[in-house]
Structure formats: C-alpha cells, structure tokens
C-alpha cells in the first residue's frame, strides 16, 4: 500500500516537471523566432549600408578626380603668375641697381631678411653675367659688389650660428649656390681640425682624428647639403695637416738622432695604426672612391716605405754586428778568420801536433746574444709583414733570413764550433783534455731549437707557397746540417781525446805491477785507474750537462765500448799472478761501477763480461774450468777466454783445462 502511494507521488512530480519542460520549450521557440526575424532585418540593413558605401566611394572618386583636375588647372595658371611675379620683382630690384641711388628696399636693408636677400642677389648676379659687359658694366660691378657683401654676411652668420644646427643648415643651403661656399667649408673644417693636438707617440692623434670624424659626421649631414664632400674635405685636411705633420716630425726626430731602431719601430706602428684607422673610416662611407683613403695614406708614408727594405737590412746588419762585437770584446777575444778548406787543414795539422788553443775553456756561445739577434729578426719579420706589399714581402723575408744565418749561424755558432774543434787535440794527449766542447754542443743545441722555432713561426708562414720557399728552406737546412755535422765531428774527436788520455794514464802501469813478489800489499784500485776514473767522471758529468736523450745515450755507449776495447787490449799486455789478478779486478771493477751509472745496458753487459774474464785470472787453478763456463761468459768468444787464461803465470800448471 505504501509503495503504491510513493509511486503516485513520483508520478505527480513527473507530470509537474513535464509541464515545466513544455512551457520552457514553448518560450524558447518563441524567442528563437523573434531572434531570426531580428537577424533577417539586420542583414537587410547591412546590405543597404554596403550599397550606400559603394555609392559614397564612387562619389568621392569622382570628386577627387575633379579636385585634382582643378588643382592642375590652378597650378598651370599660378605658375606663370608666380614666375611673372618673381620676374617683376627681379626687374624692380634690377632697376635699383641700375640707378645710382642707394639700395632702399627692405630686403636689402633688413638684417633679418638676409637669406631672402641672398637668394635674390644670387639670381640677379646670374642674370647680370649674361648681359653685355660693355653696356651693363656698372650694374654688373654693383651687383657683384653686393654679391660679395651678402656672401661675407652669410659666412659670418654661419660662423655665428655654431650652436644652432637648424640655422646653420638654412645658411649653408643658400650659401651652397655662392662662390664662397667652398671657403665656408674650409673655415668650418679648419675649425674642427683645431681640436686635434699632437701628443704621445703619434698613435693618440690617430685616435683623436677617428673620434672627430665619428662625432662630426651626423652634425655635418644635418648642416650641409652635400655632406659627403664636406666629410672628404675634413678627412683630407686631417691627413695632409695634423696627421702628416705629427708623423713626419716623429720620424724626422728619429732620423736626426740616428735612432734607427725607433725609426723602424715607429714607422711600422704608425703605418699599421693608420691602416686600422682607415678601416674604421671606411665604415663611415666617407667617399664613393674606394682608393680615396689608400691614396691619402700613400701620400704620407710612400717615401718612407720606398726605402724601408734597404734601411731594415742595414739596421739588422749593424745591430747584429754590434751585438757580436760587444760579446767578443767582453771576452777580450779577437776573432780569427775561419772557413774554407785551408783553414780546416791548418786546424787539423795543429791538432795533430798538439798545438791547440783552448781559450781557457771559453765556449764563445752566448744564449743571450742569440736571443737578442732572434728578437731583432723577429721584429723585422713583423715590420716586413706590415710595410711590404705582397709581391715584395717574400724576397725581403729571404734577405732577413740571410742576415740571420750570416750572423747567428756563420759569425757566432759556426765560429764557436770551429773554435771548439780547434781546441781538441788529435794526438794522444799527455795532459788532461778539457771538456768544454760538450758545453759548446749544449749551448749550440739550445740556440738551434730557438732558430727552428722562429723558422716555424713567423718565417715559414710568410714564405709558404711562394717563389722563395725552396731557396730559403735549402739555405736553412744546409746551415743546420753543416753545424750538426761539425758538432758530431767535435764529439767524435772529444771521445778520441778522452780515450787517448785514459790510454796515457794506464801506459804508466808496469808488468811488475801485476806480478808482485810480496803477498802483503794493499789490495786497492791502482793510482792510474783512480786518476782515470776521476777524469772519466768529470768528462761524463760535462757530457750529461751538454747532451741529453738519445744523443747522450749514444755518446756514453760509444765511450763505454771504446774503453772496453782499450782495457781488453791493455789487460792482454801483461801476465798476472794471483795477487796481481786481484789488483786488476779492482781496476776493472772501478771502471765497471763507473759505466754502470751511465744507464747504457749494452755497454754494461760488455763490462760485466770483461770482469768475468778478469776473474779467470784470480780464481784458483782448479776453479778455472768452472769459471770459464759461467753464464757471464756464454756469449764470449772461446778463443778470447783461452787467451785470458794463458795470461796467468801458473797457466801451465792448470790441469785438464778445456774451453
């Protein structure tokens, strides 16, 4: 029962909502109908408005056509009237000049009408120049006089209006028709140039000139009717005036004081600075002529650049010569003539006769002098890049390279090596040979590395792929190879002298030294070996200071091998008893210890085998066979082992000796 009541209530609610829905739908349909009707009416009104706009546009076009036509008609009527009026005014004012009376028209007497008066006078002047001179000479003179007065007044007005660009522009426009316009421009440009004052090393004035052009270009464009002409005039005055005066004075001062270094340096600096300034001026579009700025630059520098190459080479020759002369004077050394086959022959003969001069161990190589010469040539290469044209540059660089090779290679390094070679005796010396040639090699090598660095930059980038590249490279390589060849020859001779002196020291050993009768003697390194060891240690120390890397290893290996061969031969000159063999072991051990410090493995193996061979002389007779077959003697010739065993005084008593 209750369920049916609820269903009934819901049915009533449903009916109520349905009635509301029906009412709202009816209302919506009515409003939709009204909206459509309004939209239709608005569409019709819009169409009418468009039609009216088209009619109005057509009417405006028709009216504008009539107005333009009417304007043309009025203009065609007005122009003749205007010209007639102007002609009438000119005739009236011309009459004033024809009469002998003073000019009374307000246009001539009112200072405020100067511009109108100037325009009128210019026209009258132009007309008067077309008249017959005999008939109108007086009026021409009078108009010309007035023309000059007005022209002067315009220039004065222009100068007086410096702070009023608008007024200056008005005056300049009128004045541009007068003959004195160029004079006005000149005065204005001169006025601007007065703000430039020489200062510093010359570079500051270039910066001032550039800044002046940058700041004045907008002002000139606003004032003058032809600003490009005025800017060209300004730049022309700058170049031919203050700039040229300052640069010329600066370079003349260097010439007057004979300061060639500062002359070349300032020339390169000022020229390169001027080129940089010209690049900045090109951004301002000063002139339509692309050669305008370069022509002005040439007008200042051409006479200096024309002689630059010869002056650069003269300066380099003088400077390098003076550097070397001062160095040799500081060493109190008078250079000897070197070079050529005759000199080498004399040098070798003197060396063989032991008539050598060591100059107290002086190397005659100065790294500071070499650096100074390299710096001078480096500066010269930089100046050449700035001052030489592309066609002339490679040849000039080759000439600078020739100067560098002449003095640094020929007059300094080659001379030092030749002098060092002359100080090495080719005979077996009885006095301790000096070790300074290693220092010569060390210093020369350092300078060569600096030279190679300069060749890589800046020389090679300049000459690369030019006509002089092959010849410069050939000269450079020949010079360095010649120097390296002489240094190698000197090192070879130095090793010979070292081994020769060691031979001399050991030559004082006697046969009895290794066959002492007494067993009660000190077992120690022989005095001769001690002297040789100290001597070799000093030589190798100098060698290590003078050489490094593979060169040092090769030298030490060669020296160790030569000493090994000498000792091998020297040992076989004597016979040994057991005590003498122990003494010999001390000598060989001393030299082996010295060689072991050189870190040359191949040579050390030789000395270990030599010590093993020497040990054959010291062991007991019944141990000789065993010692002869030790691992240290595996690679030693069996005959050599046999020869060593025969050096024992008790060789014949050894039983069952087999190799």
Curated annotation (Swiss-Prot):
Transmembrane segments: none annotated. Keywords: Coiled coil, Exocytosis, Protein transport, Transport. One of its GO terms (cellular component) is exocyst. Residues 1-58 form a coiled coil. InterPro entries: Sec10-like, Sec10_HB, Sec10_N. One of its GO terms (biological process) is Golgi to plasma membrane transport. It comes from the Eukaryota. It holds the Pfam family Sec10_HB. Component of the exocyst complex involved in the docking of exocytic vesicles with fusion sites on the plasma membrane. Belongs to the SEC10 family. The exocyst complex is composed of sec-3/exoc1, sec-5/exoc2, sec-6/exoc3, sec-8/exoc4, sec-10/exoc5, sec-15/exoc6, exo-70/exoc7 and exo-84/exoc8. This is Exocyst complex component 5. It comes from Caenorhabditis elegans.
């Amino acid at each position: 029962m209750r369920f049916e009541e609820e269903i009934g209530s819901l049915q009533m609610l449903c009916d109520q909502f349905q009635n509301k829905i029906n009412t709202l739908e009816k209302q919506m349909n009515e409003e939709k109908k009204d909206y459509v009707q309004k939209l239709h009416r608005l569409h019709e009104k819009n169409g009418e408005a468009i039609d009216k706009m088209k009619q109005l546009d057509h009417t405006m076009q028709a009216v504008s056509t009539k107005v333009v036509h009417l304007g043309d008609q009025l203009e065609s009527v007005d122009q003749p009237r205007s010209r007639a009026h102007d002609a009438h005014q000119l005739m009236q004012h011309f009459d004033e000049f024809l009469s002998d009376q003073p000019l009374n028209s307000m246009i001539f007497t009112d200072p405020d009408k100067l511009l109108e008066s100037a325009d009128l006078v210019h026209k009258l002047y132009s007309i008067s120049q077309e008249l017959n001179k005999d008939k109108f000479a007086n009026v021409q003179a009078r108009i010309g006089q007035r023309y000059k007065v007005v022209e002067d007044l315009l220039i004065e007005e222009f100068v007086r209006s410096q702070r009023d660009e608008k007024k200056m522009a008005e005056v300049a426009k009128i004045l541009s028709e007068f003959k004195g316009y160029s004079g006005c421009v000149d005065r204005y440009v001169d006025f601007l140039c007065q703000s430039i004052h020489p200062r510093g090393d010359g570079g500051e004035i270039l910066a001032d000139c550039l800044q002046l052009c940058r700041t004045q270009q907008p002002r000139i464009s606003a004032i003058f009717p032809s600003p490009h002409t005025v800017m060209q005039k300004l730049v022309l005055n700058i170049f031919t005036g203050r700039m040229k005066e300052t640069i010329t004075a600066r370079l003349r001062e260097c010439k007057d004081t004979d300061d060639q270094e500062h002359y070349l340096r300032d020339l390169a600096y000022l020229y390169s600075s001027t080129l940089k300034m010209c690049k900045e001026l090109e951004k301002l579009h000063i002139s339509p002529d692309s050669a305008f700025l370069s022509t002005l630059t040439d007008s200042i520098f051409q006479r200096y650049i024309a002689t630059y190459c010869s002056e650069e080479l003269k300066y380099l020759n003088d400077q390098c010569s003076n550097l070397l002369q001062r160095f040799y004077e500081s060493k109190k050394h008078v250079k000897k003539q070197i070079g050529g086959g005759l000199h080498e022959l004399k040098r070798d003969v003197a060396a063989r006769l032991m008539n050598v001069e060591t100059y107290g161990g002086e190397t005659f190589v100065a790294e500071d002098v070499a650096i100074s010469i390299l710096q001078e040539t480096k500066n010269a290469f930089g100046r050449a890049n700035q001052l030489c044209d592309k066609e002339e540059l490679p040849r000039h660089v080759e000439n600078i390279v020739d100067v560098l090779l002449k003095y640094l290679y020929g007059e300094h390094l080659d001379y030092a090596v030749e002098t060092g070679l002359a100080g090495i005796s080719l005979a077996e010396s009885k006095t301790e040979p000096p070790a300074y040639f290693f220092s010569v090699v060390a210093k020369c090598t350092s300078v060569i590395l600096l030279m190679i660095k300069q060749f890589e930059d800046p020389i090679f980038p300049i000459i690369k792929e030019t006509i002089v590249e092959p010849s410069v490279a050939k000269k450079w390589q020949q010079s360095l190879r010649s120097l390296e060849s002489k240094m190698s020859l000197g090192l070879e001779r130095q090793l010979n002298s070292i081994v020769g002196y060691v031979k001399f020291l050991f030559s004082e050993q006697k046969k009895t030294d290794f066959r002492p009768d007494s067993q009660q003697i000190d077992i120690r390194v022989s005095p001769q070996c001690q002297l040789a060891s100290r001597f070799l240690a000093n030589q190798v120390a100098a060698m290590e200071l003078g050489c490094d890397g593979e060169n040092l290893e090769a030298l030490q290996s060669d020296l160790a091998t030569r000493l090994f061969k000498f000792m091998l031969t020297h040992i076989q000159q004597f016979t040994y008893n057991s005590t003498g063999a122990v003494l010999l072991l001390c000598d060989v051990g001393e030299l082996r210890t010295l060689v072991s410090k050189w870190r040359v493995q191949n040579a050390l193996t030789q000395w270990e085998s030599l010590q093993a061979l020497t040990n054959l002389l010291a062991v007991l007779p019944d141990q000789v066979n065993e010692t002869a077959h030790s691992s240290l003697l595996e690679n030693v010739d069996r005959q050599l082992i046999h020869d060593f065993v025969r050096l024992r005084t008790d060789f014949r008593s050894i039983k069952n000796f087999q190799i």
